[in-house]
Amino acid sequence: NYLSKNDELRKGDSLVSNNGEFKAVFQDDANFVIYGWQPLWASDTYGSDAIRLCMQADCNLVMYNGSGQARWHTNTSKGDCNMCRLFLTNEGKLVLNKESTEIWNSDKNKGSK
């Protein structure tokens, strides 16, 4: 369960860890939240007009509104790549890999508005 380049989540979509214990949800209020038994991490974008969360070909995970304006991103634009992947670990952490090397994770960074 992961996002690769050019994949996207819409409101209500989610990623689930392989062990099924954690879920990352792009909520209807535009907040992207990791849940275990309780919320563990959030993009803090609740109430924004964002409608989709896109894994771009440059390895930047970006939340856009309906007009195509960025509302949040991981600030990981690194140029085109062969493989870019966002996944939720069995420990409840979002990890973004470029060419199998970690370039961002939710434990160390909230992302940027």
From Swiss-Prot:
It is found in: Secreted. The keyword Secreted applies. One of its GO terms (cellular component) is extracellular region. Not glycosylated. Not N-glycosylated and not O-glycosylated with the mostcommon O-linked glycoconjugates. Its main location: secreted. Transmembrane segments: none annotated. Residues 1-109 form the Bulb-type lectin domain. Coiled coil: none annotated. InterPro entries: Bulb-type_lectin_dom, Bulb-type_lectin_dom_sf. Expressed by sting venom glands and is also found in skin mucus. Not found in other tissues tested. GO terms for molecular function: carbohydrate binding. Keywords: Lectin, Secreted. Signal peptide: none annotated. The keyword Secreted applies. Does not bind alpha-2-beta-1 integrin (ITGA2/ITGB1). May contribute to some of the local and systemic effects of envenomation by the scorpionfish. Preferentially recognizes mannose-containing carbohydrate structures, but its interaction with single mannose residues is weak. Potently inhibits alpha-1-beta-1 integrin (ITGA1/ITGB1) binding to basement membrane collagen IV in a divalent cation-independent manner. In addition, moderately inhibits both laminin binding integrins alpha-3-beta-1 (ITGA3/ITGB1) and alpha-7-beta-1 (ITGA7/ITGB1). Homotetramer. Interacts with alpha-1-beta-1 integrin (ITGA1/ITGB1). This is B-type lectin plumieribetin. It comes from Scorpaena plumieri (Spotted scorpionfish).
